[in-house]
Amino acid sequence: MLWSTSGCSAPRPDNLGLKNNLLLSCPKSPNCVLSQVSDAKHKIKPIYYATSVEAAKERLNQVILSMDGTRIITQNEVYWHVEFTTRWLRFIDDVEFYFPESEALIHLRSASRSGYWDLGVNRKRTKGIRSRFEELAKGD
């Protein structure tokens, strides 16, 4: 039982945010994925869009709000931080979005706060976010 409660009580990590227009790197553990990295263990694709950045943000906001267990922590011009709480064990994962001013894409980073393995949860979550975003884009 201690294992299930430790996830929700994990403090917000220090390795969040932007530095030199980059999301911070993933730890060596496999429970993090990032679109601004080259190693295959952590690499994911960014989200591309063909609209204005404002329309892309609106679409991404729709996607986030449609998902269970979300809590928006930071939402400014170029950076968003969202906490995702898993349904059963109540673990908190941190998902970050970066909107570079000169590119029509959204960079992502998704990381578990606790543990070493995530059974692919962060990779699946980012794929799901990208899929839902692209599905909404088809309606434009």
Task: Enumerate the predicted regions with their spans.
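Ser/Thr-rich, low-complexity intrinsically disordered terminal regions
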Residues: 3-140
